[in-house]
From Swiss-Prot:
GO terms for molecular function: iron ion binding; S-ribosylhomocysteine lyase activity. InterPro entries: LuxS_sf (IPR037005), Metalloenz_LuxS/M16 (IPR011249), S-ribosylhomocysteinase (IPR003815). PANTHER family: S-RIBOSYLHOMOCYSTEINE LYASE. It catalyses: S-(5-deoxy-D-ribos-5-yl)-L-homocysteine = (S)-4,5-dihydroxypentane-2,3-dione + L-homocysteine. Its EC number is 4.4.1.21. The gene is luxS. It is an enzyme of class 4 (lyase). This is S-ribosylhomocysteine lyase. Involved in the synthesis of autoinducer 2 (AI-2) which is secreted by bacteria and is used to communicate both the cell density and the metabolic potential of the environment. The regulation of gene expression in response to changes in cell density is called quorum sensing. Catalyzes the transformation of S-ribosylhomocysteine (RHC) to homocysteine (HC) and 4,5-dihydroxy-2,3-pentadione (DPD). Keywords: Autoinducer synthesis, Iron, Lyase, Metal-binding, Quorum sensing.
Length: 155
């Protein structure tokens, strides 16, 4: 099986919430960067699916408002955060600032969750705006920071 970057991260030595550069790839005419936007401490807590799903919908738009070149935002299967893919180079500090602002936008969001209707969403019943706001508030209160990659030690 091919190597997967996140499987070589020592999840016991990182401290959420954080922003971490998880990968950078040069392509013809540019660079693509992947960022680990971690909200919950690995193996200690996880976001409920409704809150995670709603954060995905809201952050997909709000991050684009604050950070040019966003390609994709995807939730992690472990439900502790998101992967953000951007045209780079951007840098962790810029991503951190945009992420913090987008979380503030989530807190201020009123009304319907964008893209959450039967026709727009593959699981439209699984949304939780109050839960999404609670996680945004928790992360902002804890304070985001840049996290260095901590590789697993040789076994």
């Amino acid at each position: 099986m091919a190597e997967v970057e996140s499987f070589s991260l020592d999840h016991t030595k990182v401290k959420a919430p954080y922003v971490r550069l998880a990968g950078r790839k040069a392509l013809a005419g540019g660079v693509v960067e992947k960022y680990d936007l971690r909200l919950a401490q690995p193996n200690r807590e996880a976001l409920p699916t409704g809150a995670l799903h709603t954060l995905e919908h809201l952050l997909a738009g709000y991050l684009r408002d604050h950070l040019p070149g966003v390609i994709d935002l995807s939730p992690m299967g472990c439900r502790t955060g998101f992967y953000l893919v951007v045209e780079g180079p951007v840098g962790e500090e810029k991503v951190l600032e945009a992420f913090a602002q987008a979380l503030k936008d989530v807190l201020a969001h009123e009304g319907e969750v964008p893209g959450a209707s039967f026709r727009e969403c593959g699981n439209y019943r699984d949304h939780d705006l109050p839960g999404a706001k609670a996680w945004a508030e928790k992360v902002l209160k804890a304070g985001l920071r840049v996290q260095a990659t901590v590789p697993l030690e040789a076994r």
